[in-house]
A protein has these predicted regions:
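Catalytic cores of nucleic-acid ligases and guanylyltransferases
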Residues: 1-190
Length: 190
């Protein structure tokens, strides 16, 4: 059997990956986000259309039509959004098996947590605070399928405890002022 090869899509930017941590960071200088039980997804919208890409660059545009349609409806020329595709139950909690086995694709949403490019501008060197503001503006009137994964400013251990009590997978902590760097980052922890 021949080894499987993969050509990276044109313009593919690998995601920023959190480093594992024993405990979430606390104190000033950190924000925290709920970690949903889903698939990491990069959503690229440009003149050629909408592409949904896994963290390894595989194309999944046909798998989640609600996300693709919502990205297509955005009133912009181009963007690259980083987030997590999540299937939710009736209470809004993630159900990984529904996502994994593609049950009820109408209930798969993208929880967007970063904006890497916008209208041709590369935002990777911008501070996370700036990227978050732009992401919130971009998705303020987005159709169903795209929503911002809100961040929380509070002690990390408190946020983690509450997230677990509510049935979420955990949290991702991000250092304020950090740029977007592909690969493992010590500015993001989970």
């Amino acid at each position: 059997m021949l080894p499987r090869t993969r050509l990276m899509p044109s313009g593919f930017i690998g995601p920023c990956l959190p480093s594992p941590a024993e405990r979430p960071p606390s104190g000033p200088g950190w924000i925290h986000e709920i970690k949903h039980d889903g698939f990491r997804m990069m959503v690229r919208r440009d003149a050629s259309g909408v592409r949904l890409l896994t963290r390894n660059g595989y194309g999944w545009s046909g798998r989640f039509p609600l996300i693709a349609a919502a990205a297509h409806a955005l009133k912009i020329r181009s963007c690259l959004i980083d987030g997590e595709a999540v299937a939710c139950d009736d209470e809004g909690l993630p159900v990984f098996d529904r996502l994994r086995y593609r049950r009820d694709d109408r209930r798969v949403f993208l929880y967007a947590f970063d904006l890497v490019e916008l209208d041709g501008d590369d935002l990777r060197r911008e501070r996370i605070e700036r990227r978050k503001v732009l992401l919130i503006r971009l998705l303020a009137k987005a159709p169903v399928g795209l929503q911002v994964n809100d961040h929380i400013v509070a002690p990390g251990d408190v946020v983690f405890r509450h997230a677990c009590q509510l049935g979420y997978e955990g949290i991702v902590s991000k250092r304020l002022g950090s740029p977007y760097i592909s690969g493992r980052s010590h500015a993001w922890y989970d």
